[in-house]
């Protein structure tokens, strides 16, 4: 199904989920990705089936929430949701297949990990290749509770990952800018060159790359960060 055209400001609510449940769907999943525009690290995706009996107040696009509020809501989502999952696709894969396809891959993986399996998908912006009815919503994380919940989980998980990587690569300020395009990040790339976990197909990273991406080195670095 094609994305629904955007129409100005939206109010984030559970109207769509209620309408779908009224039509007989019982496992409506929201799906969203985070980190698509970053220069460093994986793109993350979340998938969430919210509980009708245990609603969560205050859900909204993760970008509109401060970090403390996101953490609180992420805890409530993990506690109250019928099912939730998070997936990540690393920088080497992003460089191999492009960020659009990598984002879709992360979302597909997140959906495939849900138990129970969803019977309807509400996806932010892009439809996915699933034999399940779905609806793609422009600015879905601003207008749909389930998509907002997926966005929050993915954002919190990715931010935590950036804090871990900041200990491995302290020169780059990852805990601050989370791998996105900032003057601080640009200066670090210019001074030190990109790490193996930067997206080498992205500008300005490509212009300062001093080595080909070494996938085995990436895996070693993931092990190092996991032990940090």
Curated annotation (Swiss-Prot):
Main location: cytoplasm
GO terms assigned for molecular function: manganese ion binding; RNA binding; RNA-DNA hybrid ribonuclease activity
PANTHER family, sorted: RIBONUCLEASE H2 SUBUNIT A, RIBONUCLEASE HII
GO CC, alphabetical: cytoplasm; ribonuclease H2 complex
Function (record text): Endonuclease that specifically degrades the RNA of RNA-DNA hybrids.
Cellular localization per UniProt: Cytoplasm
Chain residues that bind a divalent metal cation: 32-33, 124
EC class of the enzyme, as a word: hydrolase
Gene, per the UniProt record: rnhB
Domain of life: Bacteria
Protein name, UniProt field: Ribonuclease HII
Originating species: Solibacter usitatus (strain Ellin6076)
């Amino acid at each position: 199904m094609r994305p629904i055209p955007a129409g100005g400001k939206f109010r984030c609510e559970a109207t769509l989920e209620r309408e779908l449940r009224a039509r007989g769907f019982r496992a409506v999943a929201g799906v969203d990705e985070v980190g698509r525009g970053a220069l460093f690290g994986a793109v993350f995706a979340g998938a969430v089936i919210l509980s009708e009996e245990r609603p969560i107040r205050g859900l909204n696009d993760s970008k509109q929430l401060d970090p403390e509020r996101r953490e609180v809501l992420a805890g409530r989502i993990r506690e109250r949701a019928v099912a939730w999952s998070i997936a990540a696709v690393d920088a080497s894969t992003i460089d191999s297949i492009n960020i659009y396809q990598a984002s879709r891959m992360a979302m597909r993986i997140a959906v495939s990990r849900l138990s129970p399996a969803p019977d309807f998908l509400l996806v932010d912006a892009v439809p996915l290749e699933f034999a399940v009815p779905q609806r793609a919503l422009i600015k879905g994380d601003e207008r749909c509770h389930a998509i907002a919940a997926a966005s929050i989980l993915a954002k919190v998980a990715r931010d935590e990952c950036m804090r871990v990587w900041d200990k491995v690569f302290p020169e780059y300020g990852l805990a601050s800018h989370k791998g996105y395009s900032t003057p601080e990040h640009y200066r670090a790339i210019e001074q030190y060159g990109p790490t193996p976990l930067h997206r080498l197909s992205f500008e300005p990273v490509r212009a300062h790359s001093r080595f080909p991406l070494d996938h085995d080195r990436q895996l070693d670095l993931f092990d190092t960060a996991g032990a940090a």
